[in-house]
Amino acid sequence: MTENTAIIKIIDEITACRNITFEQLHMLLETDDMQAVDYLRKRASEKAHETYGNQVFIRGLIEFTNYCKNDCLYCGIRHSNTHADRYRLSTEQIMACCESGYELGFRTFVLQGGEDPYYTDERICEIVSGIKAKYPDCAVTLSIGEKSKESYQSYFDAGADRYLLRHETADEKHYSRLHPAEMSLANRKQCLWDLKEIGYQVGCGFMVGSPGQTVETLYKDLQFIKELEPHMVGIGPFISQKDTPFANEKSGTMDETLRLLSIIRLIHPKVLLPATTALGTIHPLGREKGIQSGANVVMPNLSPVNVRDKYKLYDNKICTGDEAAECRFCMENRMKSIGYQVVVSCGDYADF
């Protein structure tokens, strides 16, 4: 049996049993047989089509604060980065973003920010309930970090539907390489279990190519995803940011990110899987290639243009100067060019 035949057989096995062994993962990530890699992407794309057809769900991203109390080593808005130009959006500004987004057809708003103590539970609940009152046909997703179960419950009661919290790595040692000592993988995981128990549609995820990542740590990530059964998984390449301790670390690659997107689609066929902005940052057609590898969500930016460039988790981020309407229609045309249709809907998880 040639290597090509062996790998194709492995891809078919993973597709059939929705699981992957360490040896299979190792083989799929290490192979330089691009014919086999194309087959992996093709199978993942077919699997996404089975559930979602040629539809791509579009979410409006609102980055409402770049203050953060944490000091994660990879992140440009880390607490100790004195070069970050800090900002906060008022409730009125956030509502204005939603208003323009709603007019453009967005039916999911993703409120993302650093862990900023200024936004108390009361403030977050007020923002969420305000959006839900004005746009009852829209979903609200929060991505604001680690909170207590009580806090998560209060946001849910205010109307939040989904919560994104990347676990970043399921390996303890790797987690401590990426985060300060006061943060723990155990707490991060507990937050995800709490969110799921409350009733959110939950998203976890990780950076591809972060310092210290290995096939072993990636295998733990896939096992954790299998265990958690999240509704969404957000992965994108690690891209260094010049004002962080990882400034000189090399970035993750598009190739490895696409392979992992495809693998995640095969082991978790109905998952909502974004083709991220970071993927579009490392390659001009990164997001298109992500969709062709099994992803089915894109998240154009609805934040005011004057703050876009300040939300610098990593360097060279794309689309920071474009108006929301430009981003929306640019994305629609990009998806159309590869045979996909951007859908105006909440875009829930298939079985939710």
Q: What positions do the PLM features span?
A:
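Catalytic cores of alpha/beta
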Residues: 148-155, 211-225, 281-292
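Core AdoMet radical
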Residues: 79-94, 101-122, 128, 132-192, ...
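Auxiliary Fe-S-binding modules of radical SAM enzymes
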Residues: 1-35, 102, 226-352
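Conserved, mostly hydrophobic/aromatic
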Residues: 17, 44, 72, 111, ...
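Generic structural signal for well-ordered alpha-helices
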Residues: 60, 98, 125-129, 152, ...
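Short, charged low-complexity linear segments at domain edges
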Residues: 36-57, 295
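Short, small-residue-enriched loops and turns at beta-alpha junctions
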Residues: 65-66, 115-120, 181, 209-214, ...
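Canonical Radical SAM [4Fe-4S] cluster-binding loop centered on the CxxxCxxC motif
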Residues: 52-93
